[in-house]
Amino acid sequence: MYKKIDNNKSFVQMEKDILKLWQDRKVVEKSFNSNKDGEYFTFYDGPPTANGKPHIGHVLTRVIKDLIPRYKVMKGYKVLRKAGWDTHGLPVELEVEKSLGISGKPQIEKYGVEDFIKKCKDSVFTYVSQWRKMSDRIGFWVDMDDPYVTYDNHYIESEWWALKQIWDKNLLYKGHKIVPYCPRCGTALSSHEVSQGYKDVKETSVYVKFKIKNEDKYILAWTTTPWTLPNNMALTINKSYDYVEVINDGEHLILAEGLLEKLEGEYEVVKKFKGEEMLGIEYEPMFNFTPFEGKAHYVVHGDYVTLTDGTGIVHTAPAFGEDDSITCIKHNIPMINSVTTQGKFKDEVTPWKGLFVKDADPKIIAYLKEKDILYKAEKFTHSYPFCWRCDTTLLYYPRDTWFIRMSAMRDKLIRNTNDTNWYPDNIRTGRFGKFVEGVIDWGLSRERYWGTPLPIWECECGHRECIGSIKELREKGINVPDDIELHKPYIDGVKLKCDKCHKEMERVPEVIDCWFDSGSMPFAQHHYPFENRELFEKNFPAQFISEAVDQTRGWFYTLMAISTVLFDKSSFENCLVLGHVLDKHGLKMSKHKGNVLSPEVVLENEGADATRWYFYTESAPWLPSRFYEEAVQDSQRKFLGTLWNVYSFYVLYADLDKFNPLEYSHFVSENVMDKWVISRLNSLIKITEGNLDNYRITQAAESIGNFVDELSNWYVRRNRTRFWNEELAEDKVGAYVTLYNVLNKLCLIAAPFVPFMTEEIYQNLVLSLNKNVPESIHLCKWPEYDLNLVDSDLEKNMEECYKIVKLGRSARNAANIKNRQPLSEMLISVKTLPGYYGDIIKSELNIKNIVFNADLSKYVNFNIKPNLPVLGKKYGRMIPKIKQSISSMNQMDLAGKINNNEVVKIKIDETEIELNSENLLITMEGLEGFAFAGEGSTGIVLETTITEELKEEGNLREILSKIQNMRKESGFEVADKIKLYVSDNEKLEEVVKKFEAQIKKETLAVEVAYNENREYSGCNINGEKFNIAVEVLK
């Protein structure tokens, strides 16, 4: 009836068979097309770059992003699961440069822009097969046959439409600003790109002496960038601070009073004055490499000057700092720039011409020392930005750049951020919220090649025009090709006729930030507004997005920024932020450290379900995950192995009895354990729904895992004998029907989490019996919660019962007494449970008698004392009195409250002190002859004295266990009858004779033979040797 379970087949091979089944039956496509009339649930897949290989972090994002859409499809929603590829930008260009053996813009120009663009286009799908293989293998269901691709003309056209909207709102402008600039890539970067490349670096900062004109005095200034000193044009102070003139080592120096500790050696303050008195003081320039016109080299005010570091006087080079530039513009101080766009000193800087500026730092410091204008140099650790793609030190550099005026949208961005649900919630006001609060204008343009061209044309008369569609380009362009490709260099050949002077207009040379591409995917993937307007409107905003935490400064931000400008709202309602995947020791994975785990290897060795389940349960998704194969193996054993064993148990016995649950579809069991597990199942349905609806993935997985543990180690364990009965009586039918229905619905609940194993079980358990059901579990509906089947009192009592049993097992382990050894009595601190539960406790723990509501203090030694490192810090002198107060309290009651995470208040000398689990240390152990275990307010005590009668019963249970193990090891079928042989221990033979009827029943022994001459297995029965043999009867 059922397919026989092959226990030799690995889970990995089973998953590969399921992949083939899905492929053969086109299950994935059918899932995509399901619920056509259902309400939309929208999930956006953040586009990865396919010219890089997937890593284990991508597995985490994919298993999280797969779970919620699977669940929503089962709930009846229409879910678009469109894959996407991020294909533009520096990541692609750098890989192509590397493959061609060239580096930098001059070599690209020499190679040829058109050929370079073709290479970029050809390269973007280099690793797409690996991405697809990994996604399929992990069970990540998105439509990769019809993905959105950011280099596609339709996609770019939608971006042009967006840029035209931004232009029309007067939010897109060109400015000459000091911007973060990569000298290797030759382009400015945006603030969100810069934020991803910061590193803590140790560099040399210098304190330098600027001589005041016509006086033998020096202004002491500090800088962390000595290379900018040849471009110094001013010194900036804060006019509200107090400054002093000191004599230090024979020199007159001026600095902020609050930073006098920066001086070396002894000093004498000769004058104190407000910073305002320094304004306008002129000083001698340190270098004269670059000529300029206008007034410079005098002291000015800047609010940004602080007393945190340095001297309270800042060297100011307007070419290389935004604050410096603003300050100098305000005072009409000219800007000089002696650095090339490659980050090297120009020829005019004769001592260091051609040197990369950072490499020139040591030489400049040596020069300062030689000229006696270096006061001191010291190492300084600070956070500095590097290019997020090529890792080159960024410079702050003056460039003509196109900006989106995001500063004007700050209030709306904050509003939309607050209106979005963030998981965890602290992202709202923390990492993302703070970034939005400090938002600056988006440096949009890139002086590169492979990207969405900025659709702005300029005329020499100064007129500019932004184009918002291909249609508009054809209407206004001159000789636009029918098959125009919207990339450089082709689009650069398109000219427009100027409306003002009627001359030809040329497109500006820049492309745009590739993060604008990915942030435009909500509408650009549908070619909105040119097509699919209704489809877009039904799927905007998204109900769910999820990516790694670094996307708070990347994709999450650009999604929010663009949708706020265009649609005045966030493009997503719920954002689940994921932590990074670390190695076994909590270290970041890197090739350099040799601790990188390949997704392909992990999936081949451990399987997709085990990997998925580990990521769902290891920690909250937003926390870092320590990922290593042993942990995944443990995950497989604990959950998947347990679920599989329950399924195997059912199939084994149902097949023996030829039990068909469809013949008993209306059967209702009155068995208490059956009612309990059905009640727990329905509670689980409701709990899991609530968790998944609120994106509490870890809690949802944990509740399923706990249920599987209870199903195996409680329900099946308690009910095994019902399945062993030979007759298919009503009680046995109830057990079969219950376990079948539980497994069926449990697999539906677990299907979004572990899609492979649940499919395997469904195929054999459900589809093999009923061809009228869906052909895959992933085409089924989510099970309905039935309140009428929930008995909360039953669940509560059973939970307490199970807890007591686990405590009893713990106490036995502590006393080193096997569960097969009967004990006389157990005392339990909690109130009396109904008699049924008492019978369960006695049976499970092999106890003759139990007593509820017992006072355990007579059997337990309590040791409760203050945790001195905690309490001592706060109440040091009171500790003796605190100890006295603790010892005067009911120790059992106090321990129960503290273990239950309650707070107990005491008063010492009018001071109220709160005692809790953090500031108290509690140890409890049973007195001689007793074993104790406790959890929260529940405690138990076992009487551990073993009488001769109890010992005899213990021997019987050991003998039964050995016989059952021998049956299993001999490969006997469950229903095989046997002959039992025992020998060579009179005492144990008497036990067998006394309980022969019971032994025969439980082991299916037809006959027992004593002391026959044959081969035996020597067994250890509680320290005594006993020979046992079994033989199958044909």
From Swiss-Prot:
SUPFAM superfamilies: Anticodon-binding domain of a subclass of class I aminoacyl-tRNA synthetases (SSF47323), Nucleotidylyl transferase (SSF52374), ValRS/IleRS/LeuRS editing domain (SSF50677). One of its GO terms (biological process) is isoleucyl-tRNA aminoacylation. GO terms for molecular function: aminoacyl-tRNA deacylase activity; ATP binding; isoleucine-tRNA ligase activity; tRNA binding; zinc ion binding. Keywords: Aminoacyl-tRNA synthetase, ATP-binding, Cytoplasm, Ligase, Metal-binding, Nucleotide-binding, Protein biosynthesis, Zinc. Its cofactor is Zn(2+). ATP binds at K591. It is found in: Cytoplasm. One of its GO terms (cellular component) is cytoplasm. The keyword Cytoplasm applies. It holds the Pfam family tRNA-synt_1. Its EC number is 6.1.1.5. A motif ('KMSKS' region) lies at residues 588-592. The keyword Cytoplasm applies. Gene3D superfamilies: HUPs, Isoleucyl-tRNA Synthetase, Domain 1. A motif ('HIGH' region) lies at residues 48-58. Its main location: cytoplasm. It catalyses: tRNA(Ile) + L-isoleucine + ATP = L-isoleucyl-tRNA(Ile) + AMP + diphosphate. InterPro entries: aa-tRNA-synth_I_CS, aa-tRNA-synth_Ia, Anticodon_Ile_ABEc, Ile-tRNA-ligase, Ile-tRNA-ligase_type2, M/V/L/I-tRNA-synth_anticd-bd, Rossmann-like_a/b/a_fold, tRNAsynth_Ia_anticodon-bd. Monomer. Belongs to the class-I aminoacyl-tRNA synthetase family. IleS type 2 subfamily. HAMAP family: Ile_tRNA_synth_type2 (MF_02003). Catalyzes the attachment of isoleucine to tRNA(Ile). As IleRS can inadvertently accommodate and process structurally similar amino acids such as valine, to avoid such errors it has two additional distinct tRNA(Ile)-dependent editing activities. One activity is designated as 'pretransfer' editing and involves the hydrolysis of activated Val-AMP. The other activity is designated 'posttransfer' editing and involves deacylation of mischarged Val-tRNA(Ile). IleRS has two distinct active sites: one for aminoacylation and one for editing. The misactivated valine is translocated from the active site to the editing site, which sterically excludes the correctly activated isoleucine. The single editing site contains two valyl binding pockets, one specific for each substrate (Val-AMP or Val-tRNA(Ile)). This is Isoleucine--tRNA ligase. It comes from Clostridium kluyveri (strain ATCC 8527 / DSM 555 / NBRC 12016 / NCIMB 10680 / K1).
